[in-house]
């Protein structure tokens, strides 16, 4: 474990670890949990997936836990308000999807589901066998619990009890599977240490915990959220193109952190990128983005993302798929207009009307310079009108001003 901990420290992605963990020399197994709060994992989960894969390269046996049982309750960690409880059929569906996703990204890694050992457990048995080992004062002292109790929202007994469930997970895996290490994001430290204490109180042996920093920007906000929603790993929810564009648009200052947490590049490669970043941050950002997209969606996914990006350039719109148009709209680059009222209008009026140009004078100047495009064609003159033949997939049109400014018209 000493080599692994040093690797994490050198990389700058070690938040905390249990006393004595760095002295463990015998082979050890470790697990990391994923609660099925949605039907797909998101980019924040990719840190955990990379973490499990990184552990395997150091001879640590990784195990992924899908929390069907804990997902029925909801983890209050990092949440300022109560989670909306999911129905059992929704949790089951999400769990199946997450298991498939984890199997894809972690081939050969054992995946367990905590519903296996919680199913059939009665409330009386749980309170007698588990609850008896927890002290209210200690639980109230946990940061997550304190913050929620002091908030206007408060915390329900349901979420307050989550820490017992996660602790029982750890104890079960320790006793039945010999898993002595639990890993997670920094917001999981309180839950992890509670599990370690529970294992000790049960007299089962010595367990350990290790956490990594959460993926946040310079303002402390989680990376992986956009105005239109979460960045998912499922390509049907977040396309490779959208993922590619998301990372390309991140501030340059976020690149070193992204490279460390979301890639499996070696520390030596990371340090080399740090040096190059000082002179050419854009090239490093592009390389890191390509590395992440390839890891998640494969070479084909990267090629598609690059193809769509290129096809957005003037003259190449014919290769854009319907999903690509939808992605642009979901990224806030779209506007809906009434089909009947829009068709037949002059383009110069439409460009000004949707706010793409500030005035007709600006629009005329850009048209004369061949700088305004409708799909793959520059607007011929200021008298050109919107024709039915210009509509793609019966509802989309791509407006462009040069190479960077783009807007999708969605006809309804």
Swiss-Prot record:
It is found in: Cytoplasm. The keyword Mitochondrion does not apply. ATP binds at residue 225. Gene3D superfamilies: HUPs, RNA-binding S4 domain, Tyrosyl-Transfer RNA Synthetase. Keywords: Aminoacyl-tRNA synthetase, ATP-binding, Cytoplasm, Ligase, Nucleotide-binding, Protein biosynthesis, RNA-binding. L-tyrosine binds at residues 31, 162, 166. PROSITE patterns: S4 (PS50889). Residues 345-412 form the S4 RNA-binding domain. One of its GO terms (biological process) is tyrosyl-tRNA aminoacylation. Its EC number is 6.1.1.1. One of its GO terms (molecular function) is ATP binding. SUPFAM superfamilies: Alpha-L RNA-binding motif, Nucleotidylyl transferase. Catalyzes the attachment of tyrosine to tRNA(Tyr) in a two-step reaction: tyrosine is first activated by ATP to form Tyr-AMP and then transferred to the acceptor end of tRNA(Tyr). Homodimer. This is Tyrosine--tRNA ligase.
